């Protein structure tokens, strides 16, 4: 059986029952009966896609999210690799599914043939058109090393501008209910079928069993669990000694544990996307979180003081070069002019400059010296190697050719590539930074989780990064090949689960407890309370930037927990204050 496109008459079936939309903070559901037709675990881009699609198929949907807001890591992510879109045609870019299919195989070596073909064929109607119909505005298309033609689509800014319209549509959907600040602790199984989940409310500790005939796991990757990352490192003999967490806060691998317990065939768990320019987050007391540092004006030196790669090479070439280093880290070297190009990709837009200056001014993270001799002393780099590398670089700038690694040539040199000769000089040591998972429970063409014989596990579906985005990346992650496939796999899972709902399905009415109506301004200093991670992040920024409350809190968004649909929609209007 071949999967059909997600558009058209397949979704003629509509919902017959509407429910009151509210934010669930602490629920008193009993363990009997059915609470939804479909439970979606995770409100990231895959989970939201699944929820919207299941609702379109007529199902009552309950989305369980550990955070107090939706979006997952996508709110800080970038663009979408999309094929033969209206925007490409408007810009005169000729693309086709066949060309994209060949590109993905050339780059990834062995992506999943079925899902790769499905994605390149349907990314335009089922991702681009679907999102633009919600109000998403793609404006920019970038070229990338993976693609024969430009197909890396961006809005004006990060993918938060995709998440906001998706969340708004979900909040307005009478078939979709959200349960925030709630962590799934295990799957519920009865007579061989997954029948729901067990949960705990992160704020008050209350425990609940939620029942549904179908459960979709869209819990994200495991890159925020360093033990899982190391246990699944591709080369067990060469695991980095120092490794920093660079994924979303809640990418802790829970979904992998759930599906493994359910009997899933776990595939390609060693396929991970690692960035190799991570610096410790100076604001992380655990010293485990990292930030992605960038400086196109810098040269990169290994521990011997020598350059080892073209700093402008593609991600595969850089990964191969850094993996050969012992230890697996290197130094960014730049001068005063070059320091202006330094940036932190992971920082919230509102405090980019503050965090950047904090890192440059922290002697534990950045060595600063008026001479190269002093810089060598501070860093432990060999003085001769450091001085020789800088002198060689400056001579190549004068000549106009990088004869060592071909980073530039006459007529082909970016303006920021210049001599390093204006003190003070800077040296910043960078390390591997975890990012994305490309393996996970195997799924079939309906996004059902399958065992090692290919037999579906009844009632269980997976989507997004948890499912390795269906193997579309093969061995090497590409630009935009996570967000788009997350939408596709989420929609397929939602459609399949929604259409599997029995015609006589009956769900229990929701009975949310009274919500906390305290003025949160009075409790703002109480950071670190369980279940308030997002609140903490936002309000730390408020204090840091000396914002006033009315920057975000208007009449539709009072200074308390948002507990009505209108309030939650109003909160969406504040997302871009930070992102």
Where are these regions (language model features)?
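Beta1/beta-strand and adjacent pyrophosphate-binding region of the FAD-binding site
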Residues: 32-46, 62
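Conserved N-terminal/central alpha/beta ligand/cofactor-binding core
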Residues: 59-60, 66-177, 183, 227, ...
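Helical element adjacent to the flavin cofactor pocket in flavoenzyme catalytic cores
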Residues: 155-213, 256, 260-262
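A glycine-rich dinucleotide-binding beta-alpha-beta segment and adjacent secondary-structure elements
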Residues: 186, 385-470
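Glycine-rich loop(s) and the adjacent beta-strand/alpha-helix scaffold that form part
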Residues: 203-206, 210-279, 477-492, 496
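An anion/pyrophosphate-binding glycine-rich loop and adjacent beta-alpha core
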Residues: 256-258, 262-381
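Helix-rich C-terminal "cap"/substrate-channel and partner-interaction subdomain
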Residues: 329-424, 496, 500, 512-516
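Sequence context of c-type cytochrome heme-c attachment sites
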Residues: 511-571
């Amino acid at each position: 059986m071949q999967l059909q496109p997600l558009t058209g008459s397949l979704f003629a079936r509509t919902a017959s029952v509407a429910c009151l939309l509210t934010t669930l903070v602490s629920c008193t559901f009993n363990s009997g009966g059915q609470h939804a037709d479909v439970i979606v675990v995770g409100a990231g881009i895959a989970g939201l896609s699944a929820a919207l699609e299941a609702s379109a198929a007529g199902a009552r949907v309950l989305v369980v999210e550990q955070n107090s807001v939706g979006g997952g890591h996508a709110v800080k992510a970038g663009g979408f690799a999309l094929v033969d879109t209206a925007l490409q045609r408007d810009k005169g870019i000729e693309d086709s599914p066949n060309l994209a299919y060949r590109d993905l195989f050339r780059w990834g070596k062995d992506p999943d043939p079925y899902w790769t073909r499905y994605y390149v064929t349907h990314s335009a109607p089922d991702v681009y058109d679907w999102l633009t119909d919600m109000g998403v505005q793609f404006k920019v298309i970038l070229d990338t090393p993976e693609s024969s033609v430009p197909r890396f689509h961006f809005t004006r800014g990060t993918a938060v501008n995709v998440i906001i319209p998706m969340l708004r549509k979900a909040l307005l959907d009478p078939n979709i209910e959200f349960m925030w600040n709630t962590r799934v602790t295990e799957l519920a199984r009865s007579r061989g079928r997954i029948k729901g989940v067990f949960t705990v409310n992160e704020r008050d500790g209350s425990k609940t069993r939620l029942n549904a005939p179908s459960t979709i796991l869209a819990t994200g990757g495991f890159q925020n669990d360093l033990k899982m990352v190391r246990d699944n490192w591709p080369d067990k003999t060469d695991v980095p000694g120092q490794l920093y967490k660079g994924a979303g806060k809640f990418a802790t691998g829970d979904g992998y544990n759930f599906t493994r317990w359910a009997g899933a065939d776990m595939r390609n768990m060693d396929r991970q996307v690692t960035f190799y320019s991570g610096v410790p987050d100076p604001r992380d007391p655990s010293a485990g979180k990292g930030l992605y540092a960038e400086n196109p004006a810098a040269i990169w030196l290994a521990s011997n003081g020598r350059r080892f790669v073209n700093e402008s090479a593609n991600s595969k070439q850089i990964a191969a070069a850094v993996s050969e280093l012992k230890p697996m880290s290197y130094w960014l070297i730049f001068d005063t002019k070059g320091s202006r190009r330094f940036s932190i990709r992971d920082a919230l837009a509102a405090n980019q400059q503050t965090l950047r200056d904090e890192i440059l001014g922290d002697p534990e993270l950045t060595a600063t010296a008026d001479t190269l001799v002093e810089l060598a002393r501070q860093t432990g780099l060999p003085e001769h190697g450091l001085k020789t590398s800088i002198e060689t670089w400056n001579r190549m700038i004068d000549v106009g050719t990088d004869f060592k690694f071909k980073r530039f040539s006459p007529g082909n040199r970016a303006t920021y590539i210049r001599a390093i000769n204006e003190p003070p000089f800077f040296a910043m040591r960078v390390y591997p930074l975890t990012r994305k998972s490309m393996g996970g429970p195997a799924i079939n063409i309906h996004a059902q989780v399958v065992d090692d014989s290919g037999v579906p596990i009844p009632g269980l579906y997976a989507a997004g990064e948890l499912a390795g985005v269906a193997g579309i990346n093969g061995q090497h992650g590409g630009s935009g090949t996570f967000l788009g496939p997350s939408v596709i796999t989420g929609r397929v899972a939602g459609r399949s689960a929604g259409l599997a709902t029995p015609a006589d399905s009956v769900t229990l009415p929701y009975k949310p407890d009274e919500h906390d109506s305290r003025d949160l301004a009075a409790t703002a200093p109480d950071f670190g309370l369980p279940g308030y991670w997002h609140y903490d992040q936002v309000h730390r920024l408020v204090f840091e930037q000396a914002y006033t409350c009315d920057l975000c809190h208007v009449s539709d968004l009072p200074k308390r927990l948002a507990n009505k649909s209108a309030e939650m929609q109003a909160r969406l209007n504040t997302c871009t204050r930070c992102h």
